[in-house]
Amino acid sequence: MSDLQKLQRFSTCDISDGLLNVYNIPTGGYFPNLTAISPPQNSSIVGTAYTVLFAPIDDPRPAVNYIDSVPPNSILVLALEPHLQSQFHPFIKITQAMYGGLMSTRAQYLKSNGTVVFGRIRDVDEHRTLNHPVFAYGVGSCAPKAVVKAVGTNVQLKILTSDGVTQTICPGDYIAGDNNGIVRIPVQETDISKLVTYIEKSIEVDLLVSEDIKNGIPAKQAQNDRRSVLKKYI
């Protein structure tokens, strides 16, 4: 079973718990304020980050065709240059949509597992008809060609979040998404086998905690009693 197949069994909450408790990542890898505009069907999505950077239309770098090079089992991740991002709602400084239905059509044909846009998207019904998972900050109707262009693929993306912290997404990072949102697993900083083992044990423990609570044991007591075993997996 591949890393992606192992991780797809878990919710983003499970993964965040692992990143927080095993690797002391305070955010649990979570990116706030993204909405599942075209939600995943029945399960989590997991894939390898294929990153795309957008810059102002007058940027000297030439535009790149990113959509015809989407790798299989990837999550397409689009973001703006940091100076076009905002800490505050709506989290970006342009009103145009960066991504549309034809892009999802092509990405799905190339066997991408989903798309994350740190900006606006359009053609909502098309994404949903395709059952192609798409997460974004919001929606719009206008194409982006008058204001921004894609200038780089497989580059680091810097994401300004609403707590004022800048998070990084690297090409090849694992991206997971479900109805709770989007989580990044930093591949270069984590032992995936160790992370998966912790998550599996944590899920087992929480099932026991749930049963204890249903049988009348106080929640705090059940958590303390059951979760002590997890220390050996950290």
UniProtKB/Swiss-Prot annotation:
A divalent metal cation binds at D123. Divalent metal cation. Has preference for nickel ions for the HMG aldolase activity. Has preference for cobalt and zinc ions for the OAA decarboxylase activity. The keyword Metal-binding applies. Pfam families: RraA-like (PF03737). It catalyses: 4-hydroxy-4-methyl-2-oxoglutarate = 2 pyruvate; oxaloacetate + H(+) = pyruvate + CO2. Present with 846 molecules/cell in log phase SD medium. Catalyzes the aldol cleavage of 4-hydroxy-4-methyl-2-oxoglutarate (HMG) into 2 molecules of pyruvate. Also contains a secondary oxaloacetate (OAA) decarboxylase activity due to the common pyruvate enolate transition state formed following C-C bond cleavage in the retro-aldol and decarboxylation reactions. Belongs to the class II aldolase/RraA-like family. This is 4-hydroxy-4-methyl-2-oxoglutarate aldolase. It comes from Saccharomyces cerevisiae (strain ATCC 204508 / S288c) (Baker's yeast). The lineage of its organism: Eukaryota, Fungi, Dikarya, Ascomycota, Saccharomycotina.
